[in-house]
Amino acid sequence: MPGFTCCVPGCYNNSHRDKALHFYTFPKDAELRRLWLKNVSRAGVSGCFSTFQPTTGHRLCSVHFQGGRKTYTVRVPTIFPLRGVNERKVARRPAGAAAARRRQQQQQQQQQQQQQQQQQQPSPSASTAQTTQLQPNLVSASAAVLLTLQAAVDSSQAPGTVPPVPTTPTGEDVKPIDLTVQVEFAAAEGAAAAAAASELEAATAGLEAAECPMGPQLVVVGEEGFPDTGSDHSYSLSSGTTEEELLRKLNEQRDILALMEVKMKEMKGSIRHLRLTEAKLREELREKDRLLAMAVIRKKHGM
């Protein structure tokens, strides 16, 4: 590599590559030269040479001076931040220790992941307790529904009598509930929810059969049909359209199409006429330009 390379052992700064650094020759003063040589060679330090004798071709970079540059106050290099030259290398750990450490870290990570998965999964005891708590509530709700339906049937059979207030087997008053409310049961409730739903459907079917002598009817709640908008325009056809009306509508459509064809032909004729006019105007402009150019040429030549 061209340029000067620092002569300090282990330092490879080059004057051609490291433009920001300064490179100095060894001083001619005997005392300064001795101090420089002592600090640079560092006799007795492992990895350094004690028989170094600098020449005019040796250079020392500014990295080894306090402040990054040699001045009148800083004349001796004292900074040698080079590992392996000014300090002993730390003994390398054997490969077996590094492998054991990596295995230990992997085991710790696996244990942490297993603990997190166990925390995320719900315990079976908790789910069982929740199911046992929900079952009495479902039974009481189904009993209240049956009592309400029985009261409604009694009131429909005896219109003049006042319906009694339904009570639960424990003696508590139960208010009538709205059967149109939709109750969503969780999947964990299992067979208890299915039994309650089947009882509710059977009771509802019995009530509808008792109230309606014509038989059970299907009632859809929450869905509305599309309103009958009627014949809003001339293209709509009602269910009672006769053959004469249909023919009349078809004739109207044919008349409209014929009129549109006539208009399109007129527009095409207008476009053709405009194109011819444009071509004539362009030809006139070219003729005028030619005459003007000839007049200019004649004027230049004095003709």
Curated annotation (Swiss-Prot):
PROSITE patterns: ZF_THAP. Keywords: Activator, Coiled coil, Cytoplasm, DNA-binding, Metal-binding, Nucleus, Repressor, Transcription, Transcription regulation, Zinc, Zinc-finger. One of its GO terms (biological process) is neuron differentiation. The keyword Transcription regulation applies. It is found in: Nucleus; Cytoplasm. Pfam families: THAP (PF05485). The keyword Coiled coil applies. One of its GO terms (molecular function) is zinc ion binding. GO terms for cellular component: cytosol; nucleoplasm. A zinc finger (THAP-type) spans 6-64. A motif (HCFC1-binding motif (HBM)) lies at residues 232-235. Its main location: nucleus. Residues 93-132 have a biased composition (Low complexity). Residues 85-132, 155-174 are annotated as: Disordered. Residues 244-294 form a coiled coil. Transcription factor, which has both transcriptional activation and repression activities. Also modulates chromatin accessibility. In complex with HCFC1 and ZNF143, regulates the expression of several genes, including AP2S1, ESCO2, OPHN1, RBL1, UBXN8 and ZNF32. May regulate the expression of genes that encode both cytoplasmic and mitochondrial ribosomal proteins. Required for normal mitochondrial development and function. Regulates mitochondrial gene expression, including that of components of the electron transport chain. Belongs to the THAP11 family. Forms homodimers. Interacts via HBM with HCFC1. Forms a complex with HCFC1 and ZNF143. This is THAP domain-containing protein 11. The gene is THAP11.
